[in-house]
């Protein structure tokens, strides 16, 4: 819903200043998205994926050229520019997918389980990319099941049974629930949930 792909049945929502009910196309123009499964085309080369997504977002040719080289250099993928994406290690794919999702400099980027299946060192590198994007003024919206990873965020929203049960900074949530970790906070909220019979 927040990405403008499906319409909500009720309520109010705005993303990047646009109403998700009436301005879904504007929402799509001002966001980036990285899915849980890779959002790259496996049978395209690294540089082809970058150019494809840049073109989809309507970037100018001279900007695409310049930024492609900068991105390849920053990710240390210059030597792999002509490599098919399916040949890259999982961590490299994740970093490339994230970088492509913000290539057009959106106001907000949605990351769906972005570090699933990668080793701890790659997770740390990935979060450095997230921090860099945030420093550039991009709002980063992360969904994760890794509560230790949630600690890296400025604000956390915890949903239980489709409803937001908590929303605050990690420190305040831990204080509010008398917990040492975000995992403890989540456990307390989940245990307190009333389950409906199937």
Model-found features: residue ranges?
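Conserved ABC transporter NBD signature motif
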Residues: 11-22, 26-27
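Conserved ABC ATPase "signature" region
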Residues: 51, 55, 62-80
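Conserved catalytic motifs of ABC-family nucleotide-binding domains
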Residues: 105
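Catalytic Walker B motif of ABC-type/P-loop ATPase nucleotide-binding domains
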Residues: 109-113
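ABC ATPase "signature
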Residues: 167-168
